[in-house]
């Protein structure tokens, strides 16, 4: 009897079991040891297969697919260092909640620790970062199909957040054999193969910390007080819902760039530095934070220092999510569900002077950036580039801070990012996954080092299903470090690390469109044409290295001098 055939039977059951739990997309890297899994995925009509030659990018592609689809996404890689390349995406998923199923092919146990090629210790490789781990045995007909499918169903039922690592050892041979062999092993599951449900329908009742949110008994008391709403990362519908809810209460809403609330008080990173604005906020009796991953330095400083009578943090992700460790309540549930259970009561706004500080800060930004074609100016006017019925992917480091501080995105407009661990690795790959999951026109904006870090992911952008623009802000290095008190003598060499590159040849190498505009009207027209033309275009905006950081620092200083507004 053929080992290769039974390997494929085993893998086919594994993949079919995953589809019963909503897995629709699967990302595959090349490799021989993963052959049973790859062939099973290719043969399964319920799966959409995505391929990439770089496992690090592949993991981030899956991450982007999971972000935008809100579905679990599977990944197949071969044994050895291919597995380790999934680590960054796995870490990000653990922090931001996307469900990834990492199917890592492995050598059988007898080939580990004996000098066999491409054999490493894969069990436990990811330490505590996966939410769950399953180490499957080497496939053998002595193990029933019922055991395998039940094991997978149990693991998938428990996976509510983060990644599931399934290590899959396969012995050789991996190819050939009579496909009719071992049919009885698969047939032992009867009509399950024609069904659409899991073999084992396991219901997980979570511990009390994760129970669906009962209404906070004292909410009717606290909603009559002076409150402040902080909006972190959340979905588009949640952002719209929260904006209306806070407006009904008359509570000021300070929205992060990822909140999708429309940022009713824009330029918060600037006006929060004003001492009078801080005095107003200090009168809040309650602070309610929805979502995490706050971007603004000034907002984080105020969030750390504030001392309300009550501090509540609502987010569906587990964990404390409050680096300041406030005394209060950590409510683990979806933002929209919590808002529905805790209705607002129409009240007169209590901190109206904050709107005046916000308007003054925005006016200062407009005046300072008038006529400029700079990193800060692009961040400020970014909303003008967004496609209708599209989406935005925002990179990390300086650009996301500038957009947060100087821009104002439309309420409910989908915004995606990797702000869990906030790394610059895999940003282009993640953006590619976001676009593939939704098939929407997509604007992605990153810095030059981020683009260089994930340059081979340009291969993933060649076949976009809707128009896509990759906007690379080339400030020649990691200029985020210009905002930090890094030693000036060593800053360029050891922190910013300028590379003196342009991206024209990279775009040509991967058959992408390319443009390098020299003015804001030219950039705006180019982007507009891209939405009409289709395909993927890399647009490079070359800017002076430290101008963006210097402009932000200058504006913060200017806004602190705005005259006091009468309450």
Swiss-Prot record:
EC number(s) recorded for this UniProt protein: 2.2.1.9
Cofactors required: Mg(2+); Mn(2+); thiamine diphosphate
Enzymatic class: transferase
InterPro entries for this protein: MenaQ_synth_MenD (IPR004433), MenD_middle (IPR032264), THDP-binding (IPR029061), Thiamin_PyroP_enz_TPP-bd_dom (IPR012001), TPP_enzyme_TPP-bd (IPR011766)
Any GO molecular function: manganese ion binding
Pfam families named in the record: TPP_enzyme_C, TPP_enzyme_M_2, TPP_enzyme_N
Pathway, per record: Quinol/quinone metabolism; 1,4-dihydroxy-2-naphthoate biosynthesis; 1,4-dihydroxy-2-naphthoate from chorismate: step 2/7; Quinol/quinone metabolism; menaquinone biosynthesis
Keyword Magnesium: yes
Alphabetical keyword list: Magnesium, Manganese, Menaquinone biosynthesis, Metal-binding, Thiamine pyrophosphate, Transferase
Keyword set includes Metal-binding: yes
Cofactor binding remark: Binds 1 thiamine pyrophosphate per subunit.
Assembly information from the UniProt record: Homodimer.
Recorded family membership: Belongs to the TPP enzyme family. MenD subfamily.
Function recorded in the entry: Catalyzes the thiamine diphosphate-dependent decarboxylation of 2-oxoglutarate and the subsequent addition of the resulting succinic semialdehyde-thiamine pyrophosphate anion to isochorismate to yield 2-succinyl-5-enolpyruvyl-6-hydroxy-3-cyclohexene-1-carboxylate (SEPHCHC).
Protein name stated in the entry: 2-succinyl-5-enolpyruvyl-6-hydroxy-3-cyclohexene-1-carboxylate synthase
């Amino acid at each position: 009897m053929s080992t290769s055939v039974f390997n494929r039977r085993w893998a086919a059951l594994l993949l079919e079991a995953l589809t019963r739990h909503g897995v629709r997309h699967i990302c595959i890297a090349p490799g021989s040891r993963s052959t049973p899994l790859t062939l099973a995925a290719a043969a399964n009509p319920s799966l959409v297969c995505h391929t990439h030659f770089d496992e690090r990018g592949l993991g981030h592609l899956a991450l982007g697919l999971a972000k935008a689809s809100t579905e679990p996404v599977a990944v197949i890689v071969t044994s050895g260092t291919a597995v380790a390349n999934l680590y960054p995406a796995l870490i990000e998923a653990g922090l931001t909640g996307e469900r990834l199923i990492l199917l890592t092919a492995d050598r059988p146990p007898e080939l580990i620790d004996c000098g066999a090629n491409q054999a490493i210790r894969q069990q436990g490789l990811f330490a505590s970062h996966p939410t769950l781990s399953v180490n499957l045995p080497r496939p053998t007909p002595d193990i029933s199909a019922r055991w395998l499918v039940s094991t997978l169903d149990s693991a998938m039922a428990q996976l509510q957040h983060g990644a599931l690592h399934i290590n899959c050892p396969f012995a050789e041979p991996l190819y050939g054999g009579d496909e009719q062999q071992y049919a009885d092993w698969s047939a032992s599951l009867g009509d399950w193969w024609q069904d659409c449900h899991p073999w084992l329908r396991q219901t997980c009742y979570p511990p009390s910390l994760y129970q669906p949110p009962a209404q906070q008994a004292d909410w009717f008391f606290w909603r009559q007080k002076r409150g402040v709403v902080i909006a972190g990362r959340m979905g588009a519908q949640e952002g719209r819902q929260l904006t209306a809810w806070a407006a009904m209460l008359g509570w000021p809403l300070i929205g992060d760039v990822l909140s999708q609330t429309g940022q009713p008080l824009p330029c918060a990173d600037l006006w929060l530095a004003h001492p009078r604005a801080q005095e107003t906020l200090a009168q809040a009796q309650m602070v309610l934070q929805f979502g995490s991953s706050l971007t603004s330095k000034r907002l984080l400083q105020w969030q750390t220092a504030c001392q309300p009578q009550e501090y509540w943090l609502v987010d569906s992700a587990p964990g404390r999510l409050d680096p300041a460790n406030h005394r209060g309540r950590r409510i683990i549930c979806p933002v929209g569900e919590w808002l529905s259970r805790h209705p607002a009561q129409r009240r007169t706004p209590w901190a109206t002077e904050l709107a005046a500080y916000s308007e003054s800060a925005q006016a200062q930004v407009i005046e300072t950036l008038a006529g400029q074609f700079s990193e800060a100016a692009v961040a400020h006017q970014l909303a003008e580039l967004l496609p209708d019925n599209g989406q935005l992917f925002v990179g990390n480091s300086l650009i996301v801070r500038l957009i947060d501080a100087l821009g104002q995105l439309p309420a409910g407009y989908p915004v995606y990012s990797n702000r869990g661990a906030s790394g610059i690795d895999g940003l282009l790959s993640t953006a590619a996954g976001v676009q593939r999951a939704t098939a929407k026109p997509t604007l992605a904006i990153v810095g030059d080092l981020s683009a260089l870090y994930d340059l081979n992911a340009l291969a993933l952008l060649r076949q976009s299903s809707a128009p896509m623009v990759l906007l690379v802000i080339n400030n020649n290095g990691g200029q985020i470090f210009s905002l930090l008190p890094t030693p000036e003598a060593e800053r360029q060499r050891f922190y910013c690390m300028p590379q003196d590159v342009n991206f024209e040849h990279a775009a040509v190498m991967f058959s992408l469109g390319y443009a390098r505009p020299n003015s804001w009207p030219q950039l705006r027209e180019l982007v507009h044409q891209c939405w009409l033309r289709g395909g993927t275009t890399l647009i490079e905006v070359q800017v002076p290295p430290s101008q963006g950081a210097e402009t932000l620092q200058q504006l913060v200083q200017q806004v602190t001098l705005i005259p006091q507004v009468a309450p």
